[in-house]
Swiss-Prot record:
Matches recorded under InterPro entries: Ribosomal_uL14 (IPR000218), Ribosomal_uL14_bac-type (IPR005745), Ribosomal_uL14_CS (IPR019972), Ribosomal_uL14_sf (IPR036853)
Protein name: Large ribosomal subunit protein uL14
Known partners and oligomeric status: Part of the 50S ribosomal subunit. Forms a cluster with proteins L3 and L19. In the 70S ribosome, L14 and L19 interact and together make contacts with the 16S rRNA in bridges B5 and B8.
Family classification: Belongs to the universal ribosomal protein uL14 family.
PANTHER family (alphabetical): 50S/60S RIBOSOMAL PROTEIN L14/L23, LARGE RIBOSOMAL SUBUNIT PROTEIN UL14M
Function of the molecule: Binds to 23S rRNA. Forms part of two intersubunit bridges in the 70S ribosome.
Pfam families listed in its UniProt record: Ribosomal_L14
PROSITE patterns: RIBOSOMAL_L14
Keyword Disulfide bond on entry: no
Gene Ontology annotations of biological process type: translation
């Protein structure tokens, strides 16, 4: 469960290391974001020479959450960290690599490029 002021690890090679959620997209009173939801965030920590720099406002899709999520078959999925992938306005990733596993919910929400780049889909 990601909300405003939540900090997330960045799971791609755009150069950002950590982002801070400033808005959950999808309605004026929407409070939480889960796996597959889009957020607006600001870059809090970045490596020199990367595609994004500290202070940039970016859109990102959540790929891992610590809070467990119930699936339709009754199983639950949760991860060790909160992580996101920075995306462009057309929902394609800005980076060329994805690090770590991503949730199957991304396939259902039509983030196919992220699913194809990910090393593992859980």
């Amino acid at each position: 469960m990601i909300q405003q002021e939540s900090r997330l690890k960045v799971a791609d090679n755009t150069g950002a290391k950590e982002i801070l959620c400033i808005r959950v997209l999808g309605g004026s009173s929407r409070r939480y974001a889960g796996i597959g939801d889009v957020i607006v965030a600001t870059v809090k920590d970045a490596i020199p020479g990367g595609n994004v720099k500290r202070g940039d406002v970016v859109k990102a899709v959540v790929v891992r959450t610590v809070k467990e999520r119930r699936r339709a078959d009754g199983s639950y999925i949760k991860f060790d960290e909160n992580a996101a992938v920075i995306i462009k306005n057309d929902n394609d990733p800005r980076g060329t690599r994805i690090f770590g596993p991503v949730g199957r919910e991304l396939r259902e929400k039509k983030f196919m490029k992220i699913v194809s780049l990910a090393p593992e889909v859980l």
